[in-house]
Amino acid sequence: MKKIILIIIVLTLGSCNNNEVKYLNKEYSIEVRLDDLMSRMTLEEKVAQMTQFVGLNYITDADRNMTAEEILNSDSRASYRGLLKKDIAQMVADGKIGSFLHVLTMREANRLQELAQKSRLKIPLLIGIDAIHGNGMVAGTTVYPSPISLASTFNENIVFKIGQETAKEVRAHGSHWAFTPNVDVLRDPRWGRVGETFGEDPYLVGNFGVQMIKGLQSDDFSGFDNVIACAKHFVAGSEPVNGLNVSPMDISERSLREIYLKPFKRAVDAGVYSVMAAHNEINGIPAHMHKELLTDVMRNEFDFEGFYVSDWLDINRINVLHKIAKDFKEAIYYAVDAGMDMNMHGPNFLENVIELVE
């Protein structure tokens, strides 16, 4: 939900003081500042808060290390054909990007935030990073044991403390959002992402997921020692056909509710701010456009009040992988209509959403 995203953004404006503009004045309540900001935003500026790009240096590394064929045919690293770094920087300054992921240095994070301050409303960027066992993508940070190793200790307090320390290191490097915990319930040991999970038992996975969320977010997001947690991957991608990541999942309603949905219900009850959708299809419907699960179950039944983010390029995969949408624009329609709030990642999302609304 765009409003939830903006509440978090407004919290990062706490150091500003401008008596003429309420949303920039920390003397007003969050609700007053948020209402003031929303009233000033154009459609383009609202959709920009749903638009995420990969960090500029991450793109440079991909371009440097990938062959021309890999850039054309692989989406495992970020490469935006036809867009230069200066073009993306200008989009930030124009208020057309609301979020980045994988910004790997404080210097780059600060530079991107400086560019965002040039935009009309000066809305800060929301920056996220994969931190599944510590802020390990960033050089010099603490790397903890993988989640499957942590779960084998049966010591939930360790996970809580790791969440606290990870949050400090993530914030210290300019990010506000950690794409963790992974609360997939592992049921096929052939699956290549075993190490990211807390194991095969829904109860244990739920317990460890809750402690990680509490450690990362704490009780008050207004400080500098906590980050947004992200429960992933919603849902049921951990017992795929032939054990292959991204493969479809055929599952009964009973198994879905008794096994795979339980940790997400626990995460919602723990106050998780964000949820990431899964790569896979569930009974023939891609998770990123599964309105029954995203809206009917999570929003209406579980009372999830945070926001959804897609997994890596998965909205476009409704077209290129699942073959349901005829193009990216139609894929966006299906995803946003189902409840998706933010696209990870890249160009053409902003323009297509605006066209669909208009």
What are these regions (language model features)?
Residues 4-13:
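Sec-dependent N-terminal signal peptides
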Residues 16-358:
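Glycoside hydrolase catalytic-domain context in secreted enzymes
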